[in-house]
Curated annotation (Swiss-Prot):
GO terms for biological process: 1-deoxy-D-xylulose 5-phosphate biosynthetic process; isopentenyl diphosphate biosynthetic process, methylerythritol 4-phosphate pathway; terpenoid biosynthetic process; thiamine biosynthetic process. Pathway: Metabolic intermediate biosynthesis; 1-deoxy-D-xylulose 5-phosphate biosynthesis; 1-deoxy-D-xylulose 5-phosphate from D-glyceraldehyde 3-phosphate and pyruvate: step 1/1. It comes from Sodalis glossinidius (strain morsitans). The keyword Calcium does not apply. The gene is dxs. This is 1-deoxy-D-xylulose-5-phosphate synthase. GO terms for molecular function: 1-deoxy-D-xylulose-5-phosphate synthase activity; magnesium ion binding; thiamine pyrophosphate binding.
Amino acid sequence: MSLDIKKYPTLVLADNPMELRQLPKESLVALCDELRQFLLDSVSRSSGHFASGLGTVELTVALHYVYNTPFDRLIWDVGHQAYPHKILTGRRDRIATIRQRNGLHPFPWRGESEYDQLSVGHSSTSISAGLGMAVAAEHEGLGRRTVCVIGDGAITAGMAFEAMNHAGDIKSDLLVVLNDNEMSISENVGALNNHLAQILSGKLYSTLREGGKKVLSGIPPIKELVKRTEEHIKGMVVPGTLFEELGFNYIGPVDGHDVQGLVQTLKNMRAKKGPQLLHIMTKKGRGYAPAEKDPISWHAVPKFDPHMGTLPKSGDGCPTYSAIFGDWLCATAADDDKLMAITPAMREGSGMVAFSRQYPRQYFDVAIAEQHAVTFAAGLAIGGYHPVVAIYSTFLQRAYDQVIHDVAIQNLPVLFAIDRGGVVGADGQTHQGAFDLSYLRCIPNMVIMTPSDENECRLMLHTGYHYQAGPSTVRYPRGNSTGAPLTDLHELPLGKGVVHRQGAGVAILNFGTLLPQAEHAAQAINATLVDMRFVKPLDDTLISELAASHQALVTVEENAIMGGAGSGVNEYVMQQRLQVPVLNIGLPDHFIPQGSQEEIRADLGLDGAGIQRQIKDWLA
């Protein structure tokens, strides 16, 4: 897919920041309009993250116009909003390949461009990394500046405040831009704050303020009076007390869609010393009415017709595993008012919208605070309630110590519903759920279940919920379920697998939703196929029986081979001195790049043909 760049006469002159900085300031409004239209035209044809980028067009232009990137370092938190940044940094012609196999990375990525200073994907990392870069720049002594752009959601995470607390303490030169898109800007207050921001960020104000401090330093009562008066005046229009207390000079809020005003304010702030925070107000989805009205639905989009203003409806296929979880959650809460469901800012993605509306007193969105979510669940369990933590595999990594220290050591009955286990797809290395079986399997007291279809998923959620002897996890993938018929809920016997197909010679031990692919291979080579169901406790008895009646065992899982379910089988076989070779099939020892789930599985030999080929090659 290619767009006619002649339709964007100003944008064509700004293929990179050096060209951008040659444009007259008066042309920046037209550039922003064209950049926003280019983003709409491109993403509507290729799919990708959408609403966030529409909201940061003016900020992106202003930052690259004022700062000498890539010498000056610009860091984007999470990266959903960085499409305009990629377009303006030499990647305009490849933007249609974003999130696709062998295409542009979905987030800023160090290996892709010198303008991408930090590889990102998870939230709230920008200020910590930016502070490290700022300290390095001070030691370097070349006058390099550092800017971090972070959203109002990401800044709520503890890591962001830890970094700001440190920055305020060591007084390094660092600009944090808080992109606040939670509310619209009042014209009157916005205009007043824009004017105030230029005054507060200007040289005259800084000189007077510092000079006044020196003059009044020997007169504490007067100095304190002036400080309080200043804070009172700023406080009427500037909600920055918290950031000031952390040691930042706070400027804002300002209109994040006034590119001329942003350029002037950023020019003023670039020369300032110490930690600075610029608070800008933006509209997520800016310039495209449907996305402005419903930015959540338009956050990441498939291909769509921009003239229609609607997203294509998903087919009438099987429900997603997230929806299966959400339905189970609502059904269980209907019979048990002690159920407490927790999510770290992933209500929609985890399938919890209906539950949050039907059972608001039993629903807790703790924001981007994975560590708190897990320990909060521990407290609920101690209090006699039944917590369910719904969390993506890749984000549970951020709360690993809490899982061990606050839940497992105390053997608390917390159920972890782990979504996006295994190959996730288009979001690439930072979002694949490759490691959860490995990092959970080594934790004492933890029960780990891997359903092969939606019915098993429901049964395992039910089993884990009613398991009161300690913590449990149910791990399921992104995407649609298989269409398996749903049975009445009942508890499964712990640590027991099911023989799915009887064959000879080779026994395939499958963990999770690769069962159809494993079945393809089993039929092709007449192998026995087992749905193991439990990673921990393992079905030791069944493994011993299979080892005695087969010449070889093969484990299949959509997790890292190192430390995963197959490693558990290996450990048991060696411990028992069973005389049978074992082949482990799973994710290799490297980070998995983006692509569709089907493409990635085929590349890694995890489709039916690939599993069959790996077994045949091993047996040869």
